[in-house]
Every structure is written in C-alpha cells, then in structure tokens.
C-alpha cells in the first residue's frame, strides 16, 4: 500500500470537476480509505468572520491575519477541519497526521484562534475530500493525481493562488509543461 498520509496530491489538468487545479493535503490514508483537505480554494469567509459567527455573544479581542477559510472538499461541507502544527494544548478531537502536524475537528481549537494559545500555524477548512478503500490508489494509477511530499511553507504561508504552481514545482513541473502536453487532445 502506498504511503500518502502527510503528502500533497496535485490534480492533473484533465480533472475538470471540483478538483480542477487543486492541491490536497492528505490527512489520513489506510485500508479503509483516504481523507484530505484542499488547501488552495479559499472561500469568501475569513477566519476572523468565522470566529465572530461562532462566538457572537463574546467580546472579540482576538488578532487575526487576513487568512481565509478554505473549501476543503465536497464532503461534510458544513463541518470544520483545522490542520495545525502540533501544540502542547490537548484538544478534544485531534488526530495526529505527521510528527509535526495534527488535524482537529472539535470547537475547542477554534476558541484558541487569534490568541496566544492558538497553534503556531493552522489552516481552517470547511468540508473535506474523501475516497473509499482503493479508490484513490486507482485514481493515482489512472493519472488523475500526482503525489509529492508536502511543504509547510506551501501549506500555511503561501498565497492560495500560488499553491498549485508551487506544489507542481516540487516535482520540477512548470504550468507551461501542461499546456504543451494538452496539444492535440480533444
């Protein structure tokens, strides 16, 4: 079984549905299936707005950057998934993804955002991407996805619109290579 947990999946150009030009960070991959978060499709909801909506009765004294909530995938689109650097805080529903990263689905992590108790780096997603047993492996063998080791800089620090090109460049691929490869296909 190929090891995909903690890796990036890069959508090949012929994927023209929800996953067109996406980069997915793989949070879980085992014999039951796979789950990941699209990291380069921001919604129109900022993390500051999300915090305010969830805590509308509380005084908002938090400091937020201008990070947006991303659309993590077409499954469970009303559910929040927070991918973050590991912390000393013990959140209720946290799953260790790699030695450095965890995913939390409980609201207690949201309560720390914008404060000194927040994880050092985090990505907030609504929805996730999931595959049944063997489904993702088949899609990879059908050349729907490229697989590459993830980089925290792309995951947390890079502008959303640059993440697809940057992930491809980890493999030495530049966008114009795809344009040339598409000539003659109808």
Curated annotation (Swiss-Prot):
Pfam families: DUF179 (PF02622). One of its GO terms (cellular component) is cytosol. InterPro entries: AlgH-like. Belongs to the UPF0301 (AlgH) family. HAMAP family: UPF0301. PANTHER family: UNCHARACTERIZED PROTEIN YQGE, UPF0301 PROTEIN YQGE. This is UPF0301 protein CGSHiEE_01530. The lineage of its organism: Bacteria, Pseudomonadati, Pseudomonadota, Gammaproteobacteria, Pasteurellales.
